[in-house]
């Protein structure tokens, strides 16, 4: 296991440097923050996972919940390293058992995510993980679902925060503490 101190830069700067910006994708005016270069580097992935593990090792968690789809990349690895369970929060229609659903607003329309109704029990301590926080809608929906099941949502966590889009302020305003590794200005 590599320690974050083995990274060539400050761990946060190292992670930030591995995130590619793709202008005008998926539409003009959007600066897409692409985490695939980060994931392709074993060293960068190890540093990233270690940052999350070091943050939550003493948090007495029961689960790490991952948001569909890119939250599924990091969340199970962190859950494994912490020896806790993983809870998927999926786009609607992807879970085979009885579910609870939560819809949230998009720029043009709505989306819905769901969780198995037996994914956790009252009092379970959970951290929600995603790749980035933009408008905050998906993470807020995940928080609402977990709380509906009686879980204690300890924190929301993401690799990237896009604070100019207002999601992190929205989530904090709703009482959800947040941890993000790095942030980028703009859209």
Swiss-Prot record:
Q: Which UniProt keywords apply?
A: Cytoplasm, Glycosyltransferase, Purine salvage, Transferase
- Say if the entry is tagged with keyword GTP-binding: no
Where, subcellularly, is it found?
Cytoplasm
Where would one find coiled-coil regions in this protein? none
Primary residence: cytoplasm
Which superkingdom heads the taxonomic lineage of this protein's source?
A: Bacteria
- List the catalysed reactions: AMP + diphosphate = 5-phospho-alpha-D-ribose 1-diphosphate + adenine
Q: If you read the UniProt record, what top EC class would you report for this enzyme, in one word?
A: transferase
One Pfam family matching this protein: Pribosyltran
Q: What is a single molecular function from GO for this protein?
A: adenine phosphoribosyltransferase activity
Q: Which GO terms describe its biological process?
A: adenine salvage; AMP salvage; purine ribonucleoside salvage
Spell out the SUPFAM superfamilies in the cross-references: PRTase-like
Family affiliation:
Belongs to the purine/pyrimidine phosphoribosyltransferase family.
PANTHER family in the record? ADENINE PHOSPHORIBOSYLTRANSFERASE
Q: What does this protein do?
A: Catalyzes a salvage reaction resulting in the formation of AMP, that is energically less costly than de novo synthesis.
Subunit structure as annotated in this protein's UniProt entry: Homodimer.
- The name under which this protein is listed is Adenine phosphoribosyltransferase
Q: Which gene encodes it?
A: apt
């Amino acid at each position: 296991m590599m320690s974050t101190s083995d990274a060539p830069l400050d761990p946060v700067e190292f992670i930030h440097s591995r995130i590619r910006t793709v202008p005008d994708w998926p539409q003009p005016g959007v600066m897409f923050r692409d985490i695939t270069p980060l994931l392709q580097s074993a060293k960068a992935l190890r540093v990233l996972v270690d940052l999350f593990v070091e943050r939550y090792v003493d948090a007495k968690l029961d689960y790490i919940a991952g948001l569909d789809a890119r939250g599924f990349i990091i969340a199970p690895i962190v859950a494994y390293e912490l020896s806790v369970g993983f809870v998927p929060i999926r786009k609607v229609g992807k879970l085979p058992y009885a579910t609870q659903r939560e819809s949230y607003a998009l720029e043009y329309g709505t989306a819905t995510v769901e969780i198995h109704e037996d994914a956790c029990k009252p009092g379970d301590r959970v951290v929600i993980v995603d790749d980035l926080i933009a408008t905050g809608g998906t993470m807020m929906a995940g928080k609402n679902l977990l709380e509906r099941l009686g879980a204690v949502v300890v924190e929301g966590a993401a690799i990237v925060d896009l604070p100019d889009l207002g999601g992190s302020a929205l989530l904090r305003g709703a009482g959800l503490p947040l941890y993000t590794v790095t942030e980028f200005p703009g859209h």
